[in-house]
C-alpha cells in the first residue's frame, strides 16, 4: 500500500511548492517605482511613449459594463485538504521517513457558518470511509480533473478570461477547462455527467453568478473524503471587491447526500507580479503507480 502513495505524495509536494510560490508573488513582490520623467526642453517635440519589455497594459475596470475578472487568481487556505476545521495531522506511520513533509496543515472551516457539512447519516459513513482510504478514490491523486467547486480553492492558481460576453476559466492541474455559458438563458443541461459538469452564468448586478450541474459522482471535494452525488447543484457567486480581490461563495445543494444546502466562502487573490502566468501542471506521470500498480509492478520507474 505504501508504494501506491508515491504518485500522490509527489503531487502533494508539487502543489505545496506552487502554493508557496503563489503566496510569495502575491504578498511579497512589489513593483519598483518609476523614475520621474525629465522636463521637455523649450521647442522640443512631444515624446512618444515606447512600451518597455514586460510592461503591463492599463487594466480596465469594466468590460462591456461588467466588472473585470480577468487575471490569475488563487485561494490561500487549506480547504483543498479539508473544507471543515482540522488540526495538524499526517500520513500513516509507515511513511515516517518523510518526516514533516508528510504533515497536513491545520485550517479553519471555510463553511460560511463555520460549522460542518450537513451529511445524511449514510453519507457521513461514506465520508469517513473515504477519509480512511485516502488517496484511493480521490480524483486529485489520480490526476483527474477536480470539478466544481474544488478547482477554485485548489492550491494551484487558475486563470479567468473574460470577453464582452463569454467567460472561460483555465485550471493548470490536469488540464482543466471550463466554459461558462453566458448566452444560455434557458439554463440547459448536458446529456451526460462529466468531471466539469455544465456551467451556466449570468449577472446579478455586479456579481457573476454561475450555476453548475451534471457533475460526475466520482469527484471529491477535498483530500478529507468529502464528496457529493451526481445530483449536486453548485451556485457560485464571484464579487469583485477591488482589482486584486474576489469574494467567492459557493452553495452546494445535493438532496441525496446532504440534509440541506450549505455554503463555503473565501477570498481569492489576483497575482500581481509582472508577467504572472498559470503554468500547466502535467500530473499524469506521477499517478502511474497509483493507477496501474497491478499492471506495471511494484518498482517505480527511475
Predicted regions located by residue number:
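PEST-like low-complexity, intrinsically disordered acidic/proline/serine-rich tracts
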Residues: 2-302
Amino acid at each position: 500500500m505504501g508504494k501506491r502513495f508515491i504518485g500522490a505524495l509527489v503531487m502533494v509536494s508539487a502543489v505545496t511548492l506552487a502554493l508557496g510560490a503563489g503566496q510569495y508573488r502575491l504578498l511579497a513582490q512589489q513593483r519598483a517605482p518609476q523614475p520621474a520623467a525629465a522636463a521637455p526642453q523649450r521647442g522640443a517635440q512631444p515624446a512618444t511613449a515606447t512600451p518597455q519589455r514586460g510592461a503591463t497594459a492599463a487594466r480596465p475596470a469594466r468590460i462591456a459594463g461588467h466588472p473585470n475578472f480577468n487575471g490569475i487568481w488563487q485561494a490561500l487556505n487549506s480547504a483543498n485538504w479539508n473544507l471543515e476545521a482540522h488540526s495538524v495531522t499526517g500520513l500513516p506511520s509507515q511513511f515516517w521517513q518523510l518526516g514533516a513533509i508528510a504533515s497536513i496543515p491545520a485550517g479553519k472551516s471555510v463553511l460560511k457558518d463555520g460549522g460542518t457539512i450537513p451529511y445524511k447519516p449514510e453519507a457521513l459513513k461514506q465520508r469517513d470511509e473515504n477519509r480512511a482510504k485516502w488517496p484511493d478514490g480521490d480524483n486529485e491523486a489520480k490526476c483527474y480533473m477536480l470539478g466544481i467547486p474544488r478547482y477554485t480553492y485548489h492550491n494551484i492558481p487558475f486563470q479567468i478570461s473574460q470577453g464582452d460576453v463569454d467567460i472561460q476559466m483555465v485550471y493548470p492541474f490536469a488540464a482543466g477547462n471550463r466554459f461558462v455559458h453566458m448566452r444560455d438563458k434557458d439554463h440547459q443541461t448536458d446529456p451526460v455527467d462529466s468531471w466539469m459538469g455544465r456551467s451556466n452564468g449570468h449577472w446579478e448586478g455586479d456579481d457573476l453568478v454561475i450555476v453548475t450541474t451534471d457533475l460526475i459522482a466520482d469527484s471529491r471535494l477535498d483530500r478529507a473524503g468529502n464528496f457529493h452525488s451526481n445530483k449536486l447543484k453548485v451556485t457560485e457567486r464571484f464579487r469583485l471587491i477591488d482589482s486584486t480581490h474576489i469574494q467567492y461563495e459557493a452553495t452546494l445543494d445535493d438532496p441525496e447526500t446532504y440534509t440541506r444546502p450549505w455554503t463555503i466562502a473565501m477570498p481569492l487573490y489576483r497575482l500581481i507580479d509582472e508577467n504572472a502566468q498559470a503554468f500547466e501542471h502535467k500530473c499524469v506521470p506521477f499517478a502511474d503507480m497509483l493507477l496501474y500498480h497491478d499492471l506495471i509492478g511494484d518498482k517505480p520507474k527511475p
